[in-house]
Amino acid sequence: MCDDEVAALVVDNGSGMCKAGFAGDDAPRAVFPSIVGRPRHQGVMVGMGQKDSYVGDEAQSKRGILTLKYPIEHGIVTNWDDMEKIWHHTFYNELRVAPEEHPVLLTEAPLNPKANREKMTQIMFETFNAPAMYVAIQAVLSLYASGRTTGIVLDSGDGVTHTVPIYEGYALPHAILRLDLAGRDLTDYLMKILTERGYSFTTTAEREIVRDIKEKLCYVALDFENEMATAASSSSLEKSYELPDGQVITIGNERFRCPESLFQPSFLGMESAGIHETTYNSIMKCDVDIRKDLYANTVLSGGTTMFPGIADRMQKEITALAPSTMKIKIIAPPERKYSVWIGGSILASLSTFQQMWISKQEYDESGPSIVHRKCF
């Protein structure tokens, strides 16, 4: 790695979207759905040069004839054959690079099982022949992207939400909390409450439409009860949305009822604490001396934190839970949808990081377990 010309590759594999690009860039070059599709019926499309699998956007666009699978569930890789296909697609089709010529920085979910990071390491070195690689925890990268080394990150994506307290660059594993409530659940809930309004969304194709409605029209209310009253008494909160077939639907209190379930998981029939309480519980599991730093550096990250109004609501809810004299600051960077990737891009291009890479040589000498010694 003495040659500075070679840019490292940064790949953030999320449950919903894969973000990939080159270290030193300020945004990922490729963002595509983390899905692998296989034809439902063998040989239906004779002579069409049918492939046995499709990845990402191509799988999405052909979803009518495919069975779609997400190899990453709740942030953790569960299907390695499909994961390998996603990485192959990332390197060869999206970035158009030879992975054996670039160091690769991968990201992992907090509390990722040890066997998983070993498997990632093994695939990078043995299947893709990477010269060097590193595995970084997603939330830690988001914190770096915000220019901090101490703080608590609320990272909420498509498949899972975590609260991760970080002190001087190290995640504190005993205080990390996981909440299996994220973007995909909100989309499902919006499908359900729109059905109650008389609009039917059931297929996977229609689910994508609902996801778009969620991303474009939903917001978090500062005071849920007040907002419900406003919605009931006037049409000021109503918005219309045009479906692909030209039909126009109107959406009212669903706009804020959907993301409200982040704060009240009981809406989804879940008996867990909301994101505000989970953040607070996570802080309370930390040493009393660092709590002040965590309250003052609460960083939001991931696509599910993109709802307008979420930062103000978090501020209000955490202020209500915390000691009255505590200074609370919620940091919601505008680029937080990609902050894990951006943090990876920053880390992999630091001169001080270059000695941290696991080289192919070290891997050959020690095997996959090297990852636990070099990446923590």
UniProtKB/Swiss-Prot annotation:
InterPro entries: Actin (IPR004000), Actin/actin-like_CS (IPR020902), Actin_CS (IPR004001), ATPase_NBD (IPR043129)
Keywords annotated in UniProt: Acetylation, ATP-binding, Cytoplasm, Cytoskeleton, Hydrolase, Muscle protein, Nucleotide-binding
A single MF term (Gene Ontology): hydrolase activity
Further comment found in the protein's record: There are at least 12 actin genes in P.magellanicus. Only one actin gene is expressed in the adductor muscle.
Function: Actins are highly conserved proteins that are involved in various types of cell motility and are ubiquitously expressed in all eukaryotic cells.
Source organism (scientific name): Placopecten magellanicus
Protein name: Actin, adductor muscle
Catalytic activity, as annotated: ATP + H2O = ADP + phosphate + H(+)
EC number: 3.6.4.-
Record's subcellular location: Cytoplasm, Cytoskeleton
Propeptide residues according to the Swiss-Prot or TrEMBL record: 1-2
Uppermost EC category: hydrolase
